[in-house]
From Swiss-Prot:
GO terms for molecular function: ATP binding; CMP kinase activity; dCMP kinase activity. It comes from Porphyromonas gingivalis (strain ATCC 33277 / DSM 20709 / CIP 103683 / JCM 12257 / NCTC 11834 / 2561). Its main location: cytoplasm. It comes from the Bacteria. It catalyses: CMP + ATP = CDP + ADP; dCMP + ATP = dCDP + ADP. Transmembrane segments: none annotated. Coiled coil: none annotated. It is found in: Cytoplasm. The keyword ATP-binding applies. GO terms for biological process: nucleobase-containing small molecule interconversion; pyrimidine nucleotide metabolic process. It is an enzyme of class 2 (transferase). This is Cytidylate kinase. GO terms for cellular component: cytosol. Its EC number is 2.7.4.25.
């Protein structure tokens, strides 16, 4: 049996990183960590605490209260997938709302938020054997990761995928244009922020999944894993 490694999967929003990371982790027996869910949980906390006034975040209050934000993952026995908990409450569905999606990128630009999240993520990966997806895993969190993937897809493809997810969850009001505008704005913020901007690591393998099925993506990732580990 080969020694466990760290697998970093980075890329744009709504390009299917979480789905492929979950599938890969399950197939190879690794732990999956959804770092995007961590930032979404902080965002949900800020919304529930009323820290947004007229679209502006009270960053100083959030900074003062970051020590009160506890994010954990627990395995759902029925689905076999990890779910996100905020201060002991299952918020897996709540963090996927459009309101959270609209505010998560500004939250993720805050240095004190990213520093806190990166510390947590690095602690989770100390023993290796993990698949972690996000925006800066291969560049900031684990620059030494043995396997790095950078995922991309056409904006309109990502928007349709995200809209399909929202419809499946009962959202009948959000439009395609709403989702596309949100994705394009998140791309802009993620790529231009001062702290840990979204960028492709020099040694990352690029996966454009615009026209790939989920099984095809899984097969591609498994092949790359076998090449890296020699298994």
């Amino acid at each position: 049996m080969t020694d466990p490694i760290i697998i970093a999967i980075d890329g744009h929003s709504s390009c299917g990183k979480s789905t492929m990371a979950k599938d890969l982790a399950r197939a190879i027996g690794y732990i999956y960590v959804d770092t995007g869910a961590m930032y979404r949980a902080v965002t949900l906390y800020s919304i529930r605490r009323g820290l947004w006034k007229d679209g502006v975040l009270d960053t100083e209050t959030l900074r003062d209260e970051m020590s009160d934000v506890r994010i954990t993952f627990r395995l759902n026995a029925e689905t076999g997938l990890p779910e996100t908990y905020l201060n002991g409450e299952n918020v897996e569905q709540d963090i996927r709302s459009m309101e959270v999606s609209a505010k998560v990128s500004p939250i993720a630009t805050l240095d004190f938020v990213r520093e806190a999240m990166v510390r947590e993520q690095q602690a989770m990966g100390k023993s290796k054997g993990i698949v972690m997806d996000g925006r800066d895993i291969g560049t900031t969190v684990f620059p030494e990761a043995e396997m790095k993937i950078f995922v991309t897809a056409l904006p309109h493809v990502r928007a349709q995928r995200r809209l399909d997810e929202l419809r499946a969850k009962g959202d009948a009001t959000t439009t395609f244009d709403d989702v596309l505008a949100n994705i394009e704005e998140r791309d802009r913020i993620d790529s231009t922020r001062a702290v840990s901007p979204l960028r492709q690591a020099e040694d990352a393998l690029v996966l454009d999944n615009s026209h790939m099925t989920i099984p095809q993506q899984k097969a591609w990732l498994l092949e790359r894993f076998q090449e890296v580990t020699g298994s």
